[in-house]
Amino acid sequence: MCIRDRPKAGKTTLLRDIATSVAVNHPQVRIIAVLIDERPEEVTEFTRHVPGEVLASSNDMDLETHTDLALFAYARARRLLEAGEDVLFLVDSLTRLGRAFNNDRRYATGGRTMSGGIDTMALDWPKRIFGTARNVEGPGSLTMLATCLVDTGGRGDQVIFEEFKGTGNMELVLDRSVAEQRLFPAIDLAGSGTRKEDLLLSEGTHQTITALRRRLI
């Protein structure tokens, strides 16, 4: 699932609340939370309140730390999945992850340069990390929840978002105007949705949700 967020719409708080709820209601799920290039105080707050493994790099760390941490978390999640565990993998954010790999010369290896100075090769690993979510035939599953920033004013950030847009099974859009009314989570109901949601719900439930959605929108 991709959580599309404008600045100050509450993405990190939403991820923290989701992780806490999963830990309470599904204690068997292994939670891995990855924060990339985040503010130090945000890292401290997340680490204090989120159960599970929190792997974080703050914005006062060097570039290689961001990319190395992301790859370590990716490998860790895959090992747990292969061991038959149910894993919740949280990434905040795909935007900063893309920036880090784009600025790390080990991964931006001379592919086609897109608008905003984004090297196409640099997004290879972020795409792999986001695409690791799956429900295997045997025991084990991996659910991915990742945030992606929009409307930051940076052309490169918009390019990164476009590369991930539509690639998840669900897109949850947060609305800053709703957050400013102190309504949380600040979800844009019209912009959010799940692919083939009718296959996940009973016919009656799906009809009820559809009717409610039409009334609210």
Where are these regions (language model features)?
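P-loop NTPase catalytic core
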Residues: 8-12, 16-217
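Short, small-residue-biased leader/transition segments that mark boundaries at the very start
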Residues: 1-2
